[in-house]
Amino acid sequence: MTSSLCYKELSVILFMKNAISMTETALHQLKNLTTVVADSSDLEAIEKFRPLDATTNPSLITAAAEQPESKQLIEDAYTQAKQEGYQSDALIERTIDILTVKFGVEILKLIDGRVSTEVDASLSYNTEATIAKARELSKLYQGYGIAQSRILIKIASTWEGIQAAKVLEAEGIPCNLTLLFGLHQAQACADAKITLISPFVGRILDWYKKAEGVEQYPIEKDPGVLSVKQIYNYYKQQGIQTQVMGASFRSTAQVLGLAGCDLLTIAPSLLSQLEQDQQSVKAQLSAEAAQQAEKIERPAQTKESFKAELEQDLMAFQLLQGGIDGFIKARDQLSLLLRQSFGIDAEIKA
């Protein structure tokens, strides 16, 4: 009788465990395989999904600044910049930097990990200016009591940007190299011992759909997914410590197609879909599987070979420059918003 009861109790326990497993959301399962990062400056969304890390960019900062609830942050940033003695155009630029950091500080109150903050994209081809701006952003964070380990400075993956990040990493300033579209960029980042890279998935897919006139690719042939898998496998095969964070997703299928990647930065809209999805999620990438994959060998890289390979890769070349231009435009929009808010042009003319 006792053994019969024990058997029934065990059956009930196993049934309950299976039921719980069946109702686990895709997002919850993904978090067990990959570090999930919020690709957003939306504080409400970050608080809702509770990712470990968060990423921002000029477009996201500008969108957040346009919200009414950001008014106080903007006013505080402007006041601080003015008290520091900045005037005219320099006042606007300093306000943008302070505001960007202030958003980062607010985000860090909601997460346990790191926030990525981007350097002015107009500096993407200027190594020294990028270094100087990154140091300024780092110093601003320190002024708010934020440890360096909780910040990643985002820099575009140009040759000049990667060399700037190499210097910053040596100084103890961790970097996130963004707008990355090819293995040649990933190799340069590895050589520079960068903390983290952000290869873009969705933008690669968009480019190929337009270039090849294809409406959709099956996930196993998705050019963006395959690009990240190649980079991930190369890093694991070579024992490279730089973390790979897939970015710029167009669908949850792309996200789940890279389950197991070191990190994935995901927009709130897709996080919401994953939270409602109960499909089974399995690792698509792993260090062990990378060792079994086709071996990837790369020759030693120089500035000349990097630039030559970039120019030969039309997709990477166009998307890198297009991404830089887009981020510059977003920063210009934020500059205009601030000028209109504070009547800066009228003040300058006076």
Where are the language model's segments positioned?
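N- or domain-start disorder-to-order transition segments that initiate the globular core
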Residues: 17-39
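Hydrophobic faces of well-ordered beta-strands that scaffold small-molecule active sites
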Residues: 34-39, 53-56, 113-119, 151-155, ...
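Conserved, mostly hydrophobic/aromatic
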Residues: 57, 117, 153, 189, ...
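Active-site beta->alpha loop and helix N-cap motifs at the rims of alpha/beta catalytic domains
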Residues: 60-61, 68-158
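Active-site-adjacent beta->alpha loops and helix N-cap segments on the catalytic face
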Residues: 126-130, 155-167, 183-187
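Catalytic alpha/beta core domains of metabolic enzymes, predominantly
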Residues: 176, 181-286
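C-terminal extensions of enzymes
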Residues: 285, 292-350
